[in-house]
């Protein structure tokens, strides 16, 4: 009887277990049927679906990039760091794809670190320029034509709007960041370059004497002669048409006689110039540096005297804003964009009729705090600037400008002045040729400017 009781209990448990199993299978079958009736969601897609109210990762990354660029005061004219964002192929949470171009590895790393703190990660295909260096890589260029156009976009980009950034001139050095391939029709390639003041742009390689690092070092080590004034006339020895070089341009010195100089042009031709038109670079650099260090006020007065000496010159002959040209004449390289030049230091109001100003101060004119033109203060209520009515350098009076609505309309309202500190060349935006990285042996990269 005891055996029969034990068996009966076991049978009961077996029957109960079977019933529970049947019920579980029925429930699972019902859930499977419901799932089949709903749209399927893959694990990858589910992982990439943002939380309710949260933007997709690529949109979050784009907004973070905009905030970062604003905080770092990135300027597309001088900062080569352009990024675009899209969905990540991995579909992982917080991931986005990033493409673009960068010549600022430190800034790019800083942005990636900021993104990581926000829970973002990237599948990066950013094109880093310049390319890894090799002995054969052409990393430098020297303008070999009288003047050439620097463009703001790659000319091979479809749908671009062609716009000239500025004119670059014979003998101007530039760093090559990226080169395009020669087209099938044998048209010249183009190069993305960085100019002496950091300005970026595209230029046809046919206008450049291309050099690798070794050749550029050799060029920098040669004795050179500097152009003392704008539009210096150079006569090639083979009877070719005259070429002209701008103030501050340095060319390889071949021979110096009392009545002439012979120099080597970037394209390999020899040319001669009048004896008073050029000067030995070493002597020029030393004289200007000694004056900057020993008497900054005397140096600024020399700027004013040179500006007044250019009165009557056509604006097109200058090739750059008047203050930039005058600074080059005295071995200072400054931004050629007026709005960047105007932010080299603290502004001076000038007070009424320039009572606060001193000879050599830079002056800026425009509308709504946006500089459009520039001049140099001469003293006694006068300044030198390109008169928009004649398109020539002229001596103008600040009091007349305020009373002459027509001239104010074209030149612009006086905004502020700026007094340089030529004895303190620590800002990469204001350098002598001796301290500029492109003139070093070996040459080096140009650091970011410090603007207010």
Regions found by a protein language model. Name each.
Residues 142-176, 180-183, 224-253:
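Beta-loop motif signature
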Residues 113-135, 194-228, 261-301, 305, ...:
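Boundary regions of SH3-family modules and the immediately adjacent low-complexity/disordered segments
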Residues 97-99, 164-204, 243-276:
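SH3/SH3-like beta-barrel superfamily modules
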Residues 312-358:
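Catalytic cysteine-centered active-site loop
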Residues 22-165, 205-214:
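N-terminal targeting leaders
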Residues 215-217, 223, 232, 236-240, ...:
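Aromatic- and glycine-rich peptidoglycan recognition patches
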Residues 168, 230-234, 240-261, 265-272, ...:
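Glycine-rich catalytic cores of cysteine/serine-nucleophile enzymes that process amide/ester linkages
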Residues 1-12:
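N-terminal secretory signal peptides that target proteins for export/translocation
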């Amino acid at each position: 009887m005891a055996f029969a009781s034990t068996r009966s209990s076991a049978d009961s448990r077996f029957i109960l277990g079977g019933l529970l199993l049947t019920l579980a299978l029925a429930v699972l079958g019902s859930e499977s049927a419901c799932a089949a009736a709903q749209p399927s969601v893959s694990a990858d897609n589910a992982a990439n679906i943002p939380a309710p109210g949260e933007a997709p990762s690529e949109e979050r990354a784009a907004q973070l990039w905009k905030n970062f660029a604003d905080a770092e005061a990135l300027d597309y004219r001088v900062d080569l760091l352009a990024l675009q964002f899209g969905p990540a192929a991995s579909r992982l949470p917080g991931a986005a794809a990033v493409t673009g171009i960068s010549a600022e590895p430190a800034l790019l790393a800083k942005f990636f670190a900021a993104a990581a703190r926000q829970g973002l990660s990237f599948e990066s295909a950013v094109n880093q320029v310049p390319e890894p260096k090799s002995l054969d890589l052409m990393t430098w260029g020297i303008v070999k034509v009288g003047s050439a156009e620097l463009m703001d976009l790659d000319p091979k980009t479809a749908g671009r709007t062609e716009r000239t950034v500025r004119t670059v001139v014979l003998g101007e050095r530039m760093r090559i960041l990226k080169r395009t391939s020669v087209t099938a029709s044998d048209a010249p390639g183009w190069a993305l370059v960085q100019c002496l003041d950091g300005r970026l742009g595209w230029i046809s390689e046919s206008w450049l004497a291309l050099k690798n690092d070794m050749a550029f070092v050799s060029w920098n080590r040669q004795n050179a002669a500097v152009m003392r004034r704008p539009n210096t006339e150079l006569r090639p020895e083979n009877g070719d048409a005259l070429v002209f070089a701008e103030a501050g341009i340095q060319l390889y010195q071949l021979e110096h006689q009392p009545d002439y100089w012979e120099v080597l042009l970037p394209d390999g031709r020899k040319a001669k110039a009048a004896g008073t038109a050029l000067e030995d670079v070493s002597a020029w650099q030393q004289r200007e540096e000694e004056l900057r260090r020993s008497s900054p006020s005397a140096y600024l007065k020399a700027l004013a005297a040179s500006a007044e000496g250019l009165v009557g010159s056509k604006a097109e002959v200058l090739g750059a804003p008047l203050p930039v040209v005058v600074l080059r004449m005295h071995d200072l390289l400054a931004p050629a964009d007026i709005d960047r030049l105007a932010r080299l230091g603290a502004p001076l109001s000038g007070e009424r009729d320039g009572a606060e100003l001193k000879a050599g101060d830079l002056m800026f004119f425009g509308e709504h705090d946006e500089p459009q033109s520039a001049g140099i203060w001469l003293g006694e209520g006068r300044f030198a600037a390109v008169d928009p009515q004649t398109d020539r350098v002229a001596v103008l009076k600040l009091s007349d400008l305020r009373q002459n609505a027509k001239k104010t309309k074209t030149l612009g309202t006086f905004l502020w002045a700026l007094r340089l500190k030529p004895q303190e060349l620590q800002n990469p935006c204001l350098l002598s040729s001796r301290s500029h990285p492109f003139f070093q042996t070996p040459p080096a990269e140009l650091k970011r400017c410090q603007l207010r």
